[in-house]
Amino acid sequence: YYELAADILRNNPAEQAKFALESYLGGLNYSIAAKYEASNRMLNQALSVYAQMLPDRLDKYVDASIALCRNYGFTKEYGKALEILAKAEKQLPTGDKSDKMGEILRSRGSILYRQKQYAEAAANYQQAADIYKVLPGSDVKYQNALSSLNRCHTMMGNETAARQTEQDAERQRMAVLNRLLKENLEQLDAYRLQWGEDGLMYVSALGTIADIYYTQGQTDKALAYMEPFLSGETTALRNLFRLSKA
């Protein structure tokens, strides 16, 4: 499907953005199936088009670069992965503190970690953490960066730094859980009124709340939400299946 769409769009200059998107999605699809050669070919197609559309398509250019880097990481072509990231970073302003810069730093940290260059990996993860710490809506990415940083310090035998980053990552994990708990509790009644007690959104929120309370050690509260979750889960999934067949 993706190759056919790409061939059609390739011959229509006005549809370049669509061609690039089809190539990008096709590359992701092949990557999920572990067909990295086909994935790389399509991601490179997307990358070449997005490169011609800079700076308007900068976000897409970086996304395609990171996807390609991930593939090279899986196939242990680390030099190619780092080269792709370096090219993407050059497209960003000096001193950039955006989400895309954070993604580049995290991706580079991952490649360096695979190469057992733990100090260099830690430096990249630290920079990513510094970005995500103050970037709105990035609490989960901040947690992930701290966890990765902790692994680097652990591998280097930096006991004090490893202990500190472990505590920081756990503190951030609990902050994320509290935020998710608050959001789901606030939306629960609205989900029930809109979708009903066997609606997937309502049931999913019940499950999330129960899981968070259990993680926090609040067993009684977890059970209070787990019981209606279990009673509504089967019906919700059955309704979803029926809708998919309609």
Residue ranges of predicted features:
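Residue register of alpha-helical TPR repeats
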Residues: 20-21, 60-63, 103, 144, ...
